[in-house]
């Protein structure tokens, strides 16, 4: 009953937070639209440099009717889901395995930090040399940008677990797998939650950049072809969709999951 009550309180708090965030977002959007319209109405050749919100809205309707916008959006979202899922599925166990040995963990920690700091855009040229302009290239870059942040965060979390907990488990006869499952994994859960949010954020940027540079479909490709054909409305439409999609994913899915995970594992005051 107590856990049920906590869940109910969490869901209620989440609902209130979503209402407040949604209200703030609406107010912000209204101000942005007003400013955007004023600038567009007072510049030369707005159709080329900064189309009005109405022009962008009409462009979105046209692309919806033609079926292009749903196709581009679903392609991008599918790449994000596949790339992030594989990256998390590989990065979390990798970080935990490295954490089984404290010496190995200390050795690999700077290496993971190094690869995490090298952006996916930086490795694009060499991946294009290997695989050309293809979906494989885009997927590899998404994997690269998502796997190292989560592995680094997991390993950082494991390194913060007191050695006495690990030694106590081994003294009681726990196998390496049991130590990883019963000690390292629970102890690193807050870092796993934070790392997952960070990893998916990097993957979202990577999929857009990948589609622009090496893809043939998706929102990134829509922006790239818009620039190529001088269709500024499509470029701005793509930017708006990218921004709002991430706001929805981060504020209404990833952040609540992260906060709930941290609260569940007792690292904040309840």
Language-model features and meaning:
Residues 1-30, 253-270:
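Transmembrane alpha-helical segments of polytopic membrane transport and secretion proteins
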Residues 9-18, 41-85:
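Periplasmic/extracellular loop-to-transmembrane helix junction in inner-membrane transport proteins
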Residues 51-61, 65, 204, 214-227:
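Short hydrophobic, aromatic-rich alpha-helical segments embedded in or entering the lipid bilayer
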Residues 82-112:
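Transmembrane-helix boundary motif in ABC transporter permease subunits
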Residues 113-149, 156-157:
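Generic hydrophobic transmembrane alpha-helix motif, especially the helices
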Residues 140, 144, 176-210, 233, ...:
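Transmembrane alpha-helices
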Residues 153-195, 223:
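Short cytoplasmic-facing helical segments at TM-TM junctions of multi-pass membrane proteins
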Residues 219-257:
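Hydrophobic alpha-helical transmembrane segments of polytopic membrane proteins
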